[in-house]
Amino acid sequence: MAFDFPDQFRFADSHEYVRQEAELVRVGLSAYAVDQLGDIVFVDLPEVGDDLSRGTSFGTVESVKAVEEMYAPITGKVIQRNEAVLANPEELQNDPHGEGWLLVIRPSELAQIEELMDSATYSAKVAAA
């Protein structure tokens, strides 16, 4: 299956994406990862105000196939979480790159974004998987 990964996104090896929005960053799970999970039934996210460290678990996503941890693609503080996804996990499945976003983070270091894969690199990675 071919996926369309937005050019303005950057991706972590663990399939989370970031989209910079001024001094904040929106975080979500890539369409590829969501597709691999199948029907999503539960999402667990950190609280607003929590500090995240790049590479550490910040929550889980549960599907009919598996429970997977999600990892912070950058270090920062949670400013907002998507309550709609928590209430209705199908939102993540229906529109992972849009309304299915997970968190808004105030990054500690914006430079960490540049260390993530661009959409072309990520697309090649998942195509080879």
UniProtKB/Swiss-Prot annotation:
Q: Highest taxon of the source?
A: Bacteria
Q: Which cysteines are joined by disulfide bonds?
A: none
Q: Which InterPro entries match?
A: 2-oxoA_DH_lipoyl-BS (IPR003016), Biotin_lipoyl (IPR000089), GCV_H (IPR002930), GCV_H/Fam206 (IPR033753), GCV_H_sub (IPR017453), Single_hybrid_motif (IPR011053)
GO biological process per UniProt = glycine decarboxylation via glycine cleavage system
Which residues are annotated with the PTM N6-lipoyllysine?
Answer: 65
Question: How and how many cofactors are bound, per the record note?
Answer: Binds 1 lipoyl cofactor covalently.
The segment(s) forming the Lipoyl-binding domain are 24-106
Cofactors per UniProt?
(R)-lipoate
Keyword vocabulary terms for this entry: Lipoyl
Q: Can you supply one Gene Ontology CC term for this chain's record?
A: glycine cleavage complex
Tell me, in a sentence or two, what this protein's role is: The glycine cleavage system catalyzes the degradation of glycine. The H protein shuttles the methylamine group of glycine from the P protein to the T protein.
Family classification: Belongs to the GcvH family.
State whether it acts alone or in a complex, and with which partners, per the record.
The glycine cleavage system is composed of four proteins: P, T, L and H.
Xref: NCBIfam families: gcvH, PRK01202.1
- Show the PANTHER family listed in the entry: GLYCINE CLEAVAGE SYSTEM H PROTEIN, GLYCINE CLEAVAGE SYSTEM H PROTEIN-RELATED
Q: What is this protein called?
A: Glycine cleavage system H protein
Organism annotation: Synechococcus sp. (strain CC9311)
